Amino acid sequence: MAVNLSRNGPALLEAYQQVVNEKSSTDWALFTYEGNSNDIRVAGTGEGGLEEMVEELNSGKVMYAFCRVKDPNSGLPKFVLINWTGEGVNDVRKGACANHVSTMAGFLKGAHVTINARAEEDVEPECIMQKVARASGANYTFHKESSRFQDTGPQAPVGSVYQKTNAVSEIKRVGKDSFWAKAEKEEENRRLEEKRRAEEERQQLEQERRERELREAALREQRYQEQGGEAGLQRKYEQHEVLSRNREEQPAHPREIFKQKERAMSTTSISSPQPGKLKSPFLQKQLTQPDTPISRESPHATSRPRADLREEPVPSIPPCSVQVEEEAVYEEPPEQETFYEEPPAVQQQDASSEPIDHYPGLSGKGLCARALYDYQAADETEISFDPENLITGIEVIDEGWWRGYGPDGHFGMFPANYVELIE
């Protein structure tokens, strides 16, 4: 809240005017607050100067003193405003009263010196008068008569202040100045030269570093190109080894094994033992005709047509007889020929006929399979099963992964080489 000067306004103004009036004997007035309010009242006035006023200051209150003193330099009256905040005042009251200082300075206007005091050391009369003397400016006195003129006899002639210019000293002084100017210039040039050399060395080191990096990069590129072929072959070999190990670790499907054997045997039977020789369709037909009786007859019966073939003269194509003998020598045993010459459809029908008898309740459930190994699902999109479990409703989505309903009815993916189809 703002300070209240209107409640006790006439008394405050009267005390202030008594101090300002030079004809009045009152030379100080003291103001303070009424209790804890912001109303200002007159705490006291006096004619005893600073010594008397200092005795009235209370260490537990916030007070404002306005004094009239005489300037020790000029002898003119000066006014001093003292903002007193006692050491016993609490911090809240100090903060509230700090905003009133400017208002009180406006009311007690005309002060030449303003002092903010908190302890008795700040309001000692000697200290206050020193501040007044410093604030008055030049040390001079008024209304003091100077000593009267006294005749002391003839005065000596006034001497000239002219001094002849000394060329030597002037040259020395100028030379000294030029010497120091030259020294400063040389020092500045030396610093600039050192800075320039340091910059050149830095640029040279940077250039050498870049060239070294370029050379090293070129060498690395050259070594990489030289070793590129060997590294590529090595990588291909390692990849092939990894694929081979993975293929060996994965269990093979029985049907795949059977197909691989069938393809291998068919390739062996079709391939020619001696490439480059011509085959006669007529002789090949003669060899394929007795296949059926060969599988039923004894070895003696089989050797009889071979002897007939060798005795029959073939003058027109003599090389073909040699080829016939060689083909006859490399023929597979009759049992193996009979086994692999049977139609695949008949074998599949025979192989699939047995599981159908063992699983009669799978009709209408789509493509079904029997688990050969146990498998645990890696996530919720896969199914788990144990050996001999049945998987129904299979969808062939990939060569290595199928989808179907597991034993628990959950639909998900599973590896194709872990099951065997039931047809």
Swiss-Prot record:
Location of this chain's protein in the cell: Cytoplasm, Cytoskeleton; Cell projection, Lamellipodium; Cell projection, Ruffle; Cytoplasm, Cell cortex
GO biological process: adaptive immune response; endocytosis; neuron projection morphogenesis; podosome assembly; positive regulation of axon extension; positive regulation of dendritic spine morphogenesis; postsynaptic actin cytoskeleton organization; regulation of actin filament polymerization
Domain of life per record: Eukaryota
Subunit: Interacts with SHANK2, SHANK3, SYN1 and PRAM1. Interacts with FGD1, DNM1 and MAP4K1. Interacts with ANKRD54. Interacts with COBL. Interacts with WASL and WIPF1.
Domain SH3, residue spans: 364-423
Recorded coiled-coil stretches: 180-227
Site, as annotated: Cleavage: D357, H358
Modified residues (Phosphothreonine): T26, T288
Residue numbers carrying Phosphoserine: S160, S266, S269, S272, S280
Gene name of the record: DBNL
Record keywords, A-Z: Acetylation, Actin-binding, Adaptive immunity, Cell junction, Cell membrane, Cell projection, Coiled coil, Cytoplasm, Cytoplasmic vesicle, Cytoskeleton, Endocytosis, Endosome, Golgi apparatus, Immunity, Membrane, Phosphoprotein, SH3 domain, Synapse, Transport
Post-translational modification Phosphotyrosine, affected residues: Y330, Y340
Modified residues (N6-acetyllysine): K176, K285
Domain remarks: The SH3 domain mediates interaction with SHANK2, SHANK3 and PRAM1.
Family: Belongs to the ABP1 family.
Compositional bias ranges of the Polar residues kind: 265-274, 283-292
Disulfide bonds: none
Membrane topology value: Peripheral membrane protein
Protein name: Drebrin-like protein
Main location: cytoplasm
Gene Ontology CC annotation, any one: postsynaptic membrane
GO MF entry, a single one: actin filament binding
Region (Disordered): 185-204, 240-318
InterPro entries hit by this protein: ADF-H, ADF-H/Gelsolin-like_dom_sf, Drebrin-like_SH3, SH3-like_dom_sf, SH3_domain
Function: Adapter protein that binds F-actin and DNM1, and thereby plays a role in receptor-mediated endocytosis. Plays a role in the reorganization of the actin cytoskeleton, formation of cell projections, such as neurites, in neuron morphogenesis and synapse formation via its interaction with WASL and COBL. Does not bind G-actin and promote actin polymerization by itself. Required for the formation of organized podosome rosettes. May act as a common effector of antigen receptor-signaling pathways in leukocytes.
Species name: Bos taurus
